[in-house]
Amino acid sequence: MCSLTISQQRTFEMFLSSELRETICAVTPKFEENLKRAFQNEGFRRENLAEKKDRLHPLDDVLFTVGDNIIELRDLKLTKTPDFRISSLSADFSMLTLHVTINLGNLRVEGDYEANNKTLQYFFPIVHTGKVRITFENVIATGRIGMFIKEDSFIVEHYDLTYTPRDVTVLVLYKEESSDIRVENEISRQKVEDTIALTFWLELKDTLTNLLHRQLQAVIVEESLNELFGENDTELRTHANQLVLKANRLVDSLLCTAKSEIVSEGARILEAPHLSVIFKGRHPCQQQGLLEARDGYIQDLSTLSRCNNFSFYENEKEVIVYGCLNMREFKYGYEHYNGRHVKALVGGSIRGMIYRNKIFLKLSLSKSHEHCLTQLETIQFRSVNDIEVIVSGLGSLSWLARNVKTWMIGNLRNEVLIILENKIRNAFEYAIEITDCPAILID
């Protein structure tokens, strides 16, 4: 039985003619079959054409603290492009949505680590270095992908996917002092959150989604809307536009209220957490130094904007609206820092600018209650890219400029983004509380 029979129970969906419903039911099975086959063939083609360097996908360096311990992960890279295998795929043209389950197999991230202890640095200045290898076993991606119509083709835009590994194994390798003996220590956990992988998990998921998008977009764009739907393609375009208008109208209303709340709270500019890093001198000097930054700032939350059209999905139980926001102006820096190494003492300011960022927003309206219950399901930075860091006052320690950028990005990903997400979440929850969301969705 065609799944479209439930659409009569959908509260907010625009009516579809019987002709379009019949056409959707007729073309969907073949579309799904062709898309799965073309997707796998595109994966084989990319694998055959890719050079070795194209299979490595670099990740940003990581800086984080555990108690008094400061840990850096450097030169991180996903060691191969995943072999995406579709376990299931279903298309819902009435909602312009793909439902997918994709097997990515085992993924491996490798890099170097350096561990220091801030307290010991004053009494017993030691540093521990080595290699780290994190393996994500049997990773599965499940969820929905939003489609839009562009000219005579479909394009995929929003990925509401959950990546779940069966196990996560962290392997640390290092050599004993004055010895060629290699030591290996390993731990395994079922959840990413219980391992060091959490520090780069968001960026890794963004990398995986981008790789998936390239492969999927390359094949779905080949499907002709006119050939699939014939005379009914005009009605489908109109319907798709109505879904976009509903989603955008709700998001824009909540966004306007949330931004007003941010401004009224004086939260356009937030305080950034202190930055404290222990570092080694340039070879051959192995003496340690210390850099500490204070009076940090993050701005400007009042520049939150909708990046593009949002996706709208509805079934008999709920409505889901999802897509991406960004901060048009995103600055993060410190008015003052102090650094010391051997006899050199330096100080100045650190100013960072993030030119590209995406914040995934997902709203749900449950229809299982007497009144529609609106909830903020997700607010999460998906990507931060094109980052510029300018450091003043380094003087004789000018060779540290690249390191400072690395530390800034590490602190940004592991501490600053969490602060921003919490503030945005609070503002949207306030907006939802005082807004009649169902009324906005009803024409």
Q: What spans do the regions from the language model cover?
A:
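Extended amphipathic ligand-handling, pore-lining, and cofactor/metal-binding catalytic surfaces
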Residues: 149-223, 366-437
